[in-house]
Amino acid sequence: FAIWRITYNGGLGYILTKQSQTRWIVRFVERRGWLDAKKAPRMHAWIHSFYKTKLGAAYDMTCMPNEFNVWILFRSLVDVILLNDVTAYALFSLSHVQGLGNYGMLLFVVRWCIGLLLLAFNAWVKLDAHRVVKDYAWYWGDCFFLCLQNLKFDGVYEVAPDPMYSIGYIGYYGLSLLTGSYMVFFVSLAAHALQLLFLVAFENPHME
């Protein structure tokens, strides 16, 4: 879990900062000719097949700017990191599940009820935040190209500032309650702190 969390906050934070400032990711792909059938035919063929699978047979990568094509590739990288991050955290938490202990059935039931409520609330926060910002902002599309759209920041954005980074990680504490493990709780605190550091070090400066 630590590896995937650091990959997300440190790795993505670093390359997104460079992309935001110098178009580093796009330039990296262009230098290697991955989108050019003459310069890198095998890689181009694989990417072409990937686009057809992901976006449909009608998608023509030659009709779209490189910035958009590279962003689509980047989104898939983000999905891999996020999926492994969530899976690793879930397995880590499950490996530390505690029983009743010395606290009795009542506290056990209360702990599980609150934990499940926090997980459900976390799911709502993520889903509603995605409804508001769509894929473009969810995957940092503004680091790659500008898209003029009028966003209405309602729903979860009226509950808390930067909800995806603040209350959007309350599920960490829900699982901490479900497991009854201090180890899970302190690891969750550290992971949430890294996410807030990502917000301060990359997100806020980029938006400004």
Each language-model region and where it sits:
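Membrane-anchoring alpha-helices and their flanking helix-loop junctions
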Residues: 1-159, 166-208
